[in-house]
Swiss-Prot record:
Localisation per UniProt entry: Cytoplasm
Major subcellular location class: cytoplasm
Transcription regulation recorded as keyword: no
Name of this protein: Ribosomal RNA large subunit methyltransferase E
Region: Disordered, residue numbers: 195-220
Gene name of the encoded protein: rlmE
Reported function: Specifically methylates the uridine in position 2552 of 23S rRNA at the 2'-O position of the ribose in the fully assembled 50S ribosomal subunit.
Pfam families documented for this protein: FtsJ
Domain of life of the organism encoding this protein: Bacteria
Organism the protein comes from: Burkholderia mallei (strain ATCC 23344)
Length: 220
């Protein structure tokens, strides 16, 4: 009975969520697009001509937002792919419906075959921005969940270290909990500038937050 009440409450909140309604109206696949939008408007992350990698991209709302932003910024004389000035590569182990002008690679980005596909698209270019809305399956057991969250952030940090330009940026989703301070310290070890972000589009009840790192300390 309690579970049914919880499901009904969640459904009520979801249906009446202004960001859900806005996403439906503006054609975004998930309300998460507005989290990236708020952070981008604050920090000016996405700019014409960039190479952007979206980790854990499905269902694709972050790639959609990035694509729309690069389409708005296209220059008449730009060398661009399709309707955007720049390159967006989305990776996920899950399938994802195509997004216009976005290269999608399905698979685990730790595997050689997936990295080979990525390198083919990059064609020797370094990445300007890595965005990650990845989240592990949470068990409700605090210690186990903290380890899973930290592992996902570690994967994004390692990917960024291997692919970012020296002045590049990494934005990852994280959760406040027992391991949060350790994750922040890892960011500070890797980036010159580190800042937490809690966009208004994140639900009030959620411990979700985002960490933004800029300018690698030891670029490869």
């Amino acid at each position: 009975m309690a579970k049914n009440r919880f499901n009904q409450s969640w459904l009520h909140d979801h249906i009446n969520d202004p960001y859900v309604k806005m996403a439906q109206r503006e054609g975004y696949r998930a309300r998460a697009a507005y989290k990236l939008k708020e952070i981008d408007e604050q920090d000016k992350l996405i700019r014409p001509g960039q190479v952007i990698v979206d980790l854990g991209a499905a269902p694709g709302s972050w790639s959609q937002y990035a694509r729309n932003k690069l389409a708005q910024g296209k220059r008449r004389d730009a060398v661009r792919e399709g309707g955007i000035d720049g390159t967006i590569i989305a990776l996920d182990m899950l399938p994802m419906e195509p997004v216009a002008d976005v290269h999608f690679i399905q698979g685990d980005f730790r595997e050689e075959s997936v990295l080979h596909q990525l390198e083919e698209v990059l064609a020797g270019r370094a990445v300007d921005l890595v965005i990650s809305d990845m989240a592990p399956n949470l068990s409700g057991v605090a210690v186990a969940d903290a380890a899973r969250i930290e592992h996902v952030c570690d994967l994004a940090l390692e990917f960024a270290q291997n692919h970012l330009k020296p002045d590049g940026a990494l934005l990852v989703k994280c959760f406040h909990g027992s391991g949060y301070s350790q994750i922040v310290e890892k960011f500070k070890h890797q980036f010159k500038t580190v800042a937490p972000r809690k966009p208004k589009a994140s639900r009030d009840k959620s411990s979700e937050t985002f960490i933004l790192g800029r300018h690698l300390k030891q670029p490869r």
